[in-house]
C-alpha cells in the first residue's frame, strides 16, 4: 500500500466516506504488522494528548481534532471504545487505524471493552458493517485487528493509561506484560478487568454491577501507584457529564471524549493534554453542530421493493 493511497484513504475517511472492502483488508494487514510489534503496555512519550471513548461519534471526533490539533501535529493516545452506539463506527475506527498506519509514532490505540467480537454484535458495529458493506468481511478484518491492540500504555514511566481500570490479579506492569493479548476479550481475569473495571468510593475491591471487571477503591489505586512508581492512572470507560473527573487525591482521572453521548445525554467531552513535563491541561468540547454532520448516506432501495 503506497503512501499516496493511504493519504487518499485518510482524506476520504475524514469526509466520512467509506473505503472499499479490499482497501480495508489491505489496511488491516498493514496495521497488524505495526501493532504486533507493540507491547501489552505500550511506552508513549510526552507531549501527548489523551482521549477517552469515541463510540462511533465520527463528527464529534472531528471536533476533537479541531480542539486538540490534527494528527500527526499532535501526538495522540486513544483509550479504546472507538466503535458501537454511534452512527459511524466504521469511519471512526478506519480513520484512526489509517492514521496509525500512516503515522505509527504519533498515535497510540489501546483496546476497550467494545473492541470485542461479542460486544460489537450487540451494540452496533456488526450491524453497521453489514449495512454499509453488504457482508461481514469488514467486521471480520476489524475485529481481528482488535486482538492486536495494546492493553495499556505508560507515559514517561509516570502515567498509567488503560481503558477501564485495575485488577486484583495485577500487582505490577510485568503482570500485564505476561498476558497473551492476541485473543477475544475473556469473560474474567486480568485482561478482562483492565477493560471493564471502575474506580469507586469504596475500600478494596467489590464486584462490578457491569457483570465483568471489579470496582476498586482509592486504597487500591494508592497501592498500585506506589508499587509501580506511577503518579497518575488515566482511564475512560465511564460517562462523565463534565468531560473528566479526578479522584483519590489526584491519583486517578477519568477522561470522556464522546460529547452528547448517544446523541442524547447532554454531556460535554474532554481531552487531556500533557506537555513535555507532564503538566496537565484539560480541553473541554461540545458535540459537533448539526450543520457539520452532513446527511446520513441514503442506501439505494433494493430492486425487490420497487
Swiss-Prot record:
Signal peptide coordinates: none
Matching InterPro entries: Calcineurin-like_PHP_ApaH (IPR004843), Metallo-depent_PP-like (IPR029052), PPA2-like (IPR047129), Ser/Thr-sp_prot-phosphatase (IPR006186)
Entry-linked SMART domains: PP2Ac
Reactions mediated catalytically: O-phospho-L-seryl-[protein] + H2O = L-seryl-[protein] + phosphate; O-phospho-L-threonyl-[protein] + H2O = L-threonyl-[protein] + phosphate
Residues the record marks as active site: 114 (proton donor)
Superkingdom, taxonomy of origin: Eukaryota
Residues noted as binding Mn(2+) 2 in the record, renumbered to the chain: 81, 113, 163, 237
Co-factor: note: Binds 2 manganese ions per subunit.
Alphabetized GO MF terms: metal ion binding; protein serine/threonine phosphatase activity
Entry's EC annotation: 3.1.3.16
Annotated residues for binding of Mn(2+) 1: 53, 55, 81
GO biological process: double-strand break repair via homologous recombination
CDD domains per UniProt: MPP_PP2A_PP4_PP6
One Pfam family this sequence matches: Metallophos
Disulfide bonds: none
Record keywords, A-Z: Hydrolase, Manganese, Metal-binding, Protein phosphatase
Cellular component GO terms held in the UniProt record: cytoplasm; nucleus
Cofactor(s) listed: Mn(2+)
Record bears the keyword Metal-binding: yes
Protein family: Belongs to the PPP phosphatase family. PP-4 (PP-X) subfamily.
Name of the featured protein: Serine/threonine-protein phosphatase PP-X homolog 4
Organism expressing this protein natively: Paramecium tetraurelia
Encoding gene (name): Ppx4
Amino acid at each position: 500500500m503506497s503512501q499516496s493511497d493511504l493519504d487518499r484513504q485518510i482524506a476520504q475517511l475524514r469526509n466520512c466516506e467509506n473505503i472499499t472492502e479490499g482497501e480495508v483488508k489491505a489496511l488491516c494487514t498493514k496495521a497488524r504488522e505495526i501493532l504486533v510489534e507493540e507491547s501489552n503496555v505500550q511506552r508513549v512519550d510526552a507531549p501527548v494528548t489523551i482521549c477517552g471513548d469515541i463510540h462511533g461519534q465520527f463528527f464529534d471526533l472531528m471536533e476533537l481534532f479541531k480542539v486538540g490539533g490534527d494528527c500527526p501535529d499532535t501526538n495522540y493516545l486513544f483509550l479504546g471504545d472507538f466503535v458501537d452506539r454511534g452512527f459511524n463506527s466504521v469511519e471512526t475506527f478506519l480513520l484512526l487505524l489509517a492514521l496509525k498506519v500512516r503515522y505509527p509514532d504519533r498515535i497510540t490505540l489501546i483496546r476497550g471493552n467494545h473492541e470485542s467480537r461479542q460486544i460489537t454484535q450487540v451494540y452496533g458495529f456488526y450491524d453497521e458493517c453489514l449495512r454499509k458493506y453488504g457482508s461481514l468481511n469488514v467486521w471480520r478484518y476489524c475485529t481481528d485487528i482488535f486482538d492486536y491492540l495494546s492493553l495499556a500504555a505508560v507515559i514517561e514511566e509516570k502515567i498509567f493509561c488503560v481503558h477501564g481500570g485495575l485488577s486484583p490479579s495485577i500487582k505490577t506492569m510485568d503482570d500485564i506484560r505476561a498476558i497473551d493479548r492476541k485473543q477475544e476479550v475473556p469473560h474474567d481475569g486480568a485482561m478482562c478487568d483492565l477493560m471493564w473495571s471502575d474506580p469507586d468510593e469504596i475500600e478494596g475491591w467489590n464486584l462490578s454491577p457491569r457483570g465483568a471487571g471489579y470496582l476498586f477503591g482509592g486504597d487500591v489505586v494508592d497501592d498500585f501507584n506506589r508499587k509501580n512508581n506511577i503518579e497518575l492512572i488515566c482511564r475512560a470507560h465511564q460517562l462523565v457529564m463534565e468531560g473528566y473527573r479526578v479522584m483519590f487525591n489526584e491519583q486517578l482521572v477519568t477522561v470522556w471524549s464522546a460529547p452528547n453521548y448517544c446523541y442524547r445525554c447532554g454531556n460535554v467531552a474532554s481531552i487531556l493534554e500533557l506537555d513535555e513535563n507532564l503538566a496537565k491541561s484539560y480541553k473541554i468540547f461540545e458535540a459537533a453542530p448539526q450543520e457539520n454532520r452532513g446527511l446520513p448516506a441514503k442506501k439505494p432501495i433494493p430492486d425487490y421493493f420497487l
